[in-house]
């Protein structure tokens, strides 16, 4: 087994991403010695290894809270390198979930615009959030179904709402998606445990470059909807 090595070289990060946006990744994958890694529990600065029951020999690696900084992105790259060098693989059953800090959302209008961008381009985004030349995994139909039909039927193209505060609006959007299994999951918003909005549509990947692109794309949507 190769060790996790801290790569001291600088990596190229997108200068337009707001480093104040927090995020965390859930890397679903498979390994023939999955139980051994799960037994370790934690590796490398609080990255957690736990069982992933939806994947054969499944392991889920969850990150600590990260920011889009050179230091944190180097840590993400080190984990990806370690997994790739030690026999971890993604399968057709793996999803790639990324949580983004909901505290970045400051107003009803900000959330309206984020959903306006997302639900009106959801099908296109489902391709953009996945590696070029790949198709959306079959499991996404059950574990990350599109939300656009439910949201648009309830709130219209411009996501109109009579909610009088951000928390109640987030709750209404969460009710519209029915359960947490949605391409964009807002049910964690305002929870004490995990105040996030979760992107669930990407296929599973252990490729740093793909994760980086997905983080950039969604954080830029969050930023543009704030300053639109």
Report the location of each language-model feature.
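C-terminal accessory/tail domains of diverse enzymes
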Residues: 1-90, 103-228
């Amino acid at each position: 087994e190769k060790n996790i090595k801290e790569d001291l070289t600088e990596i190229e990060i997108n200068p337009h991403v707001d480093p104040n946006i927090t995020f965390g990744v859930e890397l679903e994958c498979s390994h023939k010695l999955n139980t051994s890694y799960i037994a370790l529990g934690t590796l490398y600065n609080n990255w957690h290894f736990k069982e992933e029951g939806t994947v054969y020999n499944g392991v889920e690696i969850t990150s600590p809270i990260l920011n889009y900084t050179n230091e944190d992105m180097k840590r993400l790259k080190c984990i990806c390198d370690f997994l790739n060098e030690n026999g971890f693989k993604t399968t057709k059953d793996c999803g790639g979930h990324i949580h983004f800090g909901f505290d970045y959302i400051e107003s009803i209008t900000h959330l309206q615009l984020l959903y306006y961008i997302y639900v009106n381009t959801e099908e296109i985004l489902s391709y953009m959030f996945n590696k070029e030349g790949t198709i959306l995994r079959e499991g996404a139909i059950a574990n990350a179904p599109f939300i656009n039909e439910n949201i648009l039927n309830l709130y219209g193209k411009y996501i109109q709402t009579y909610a009088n505060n951000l928390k109640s609006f987030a709750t209404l959007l969460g009710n519209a998606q029915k359960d947490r299994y949605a391409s964009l999951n807002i049910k964690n918003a305002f929870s004490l445990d995990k105040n996030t909005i979760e992107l669930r549509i990407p296929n599973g990947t252990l490729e740093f470059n793909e994760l980086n692109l997905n983080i950039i794309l969604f954080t830029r949507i969050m930023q543009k909807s704030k300053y639109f």
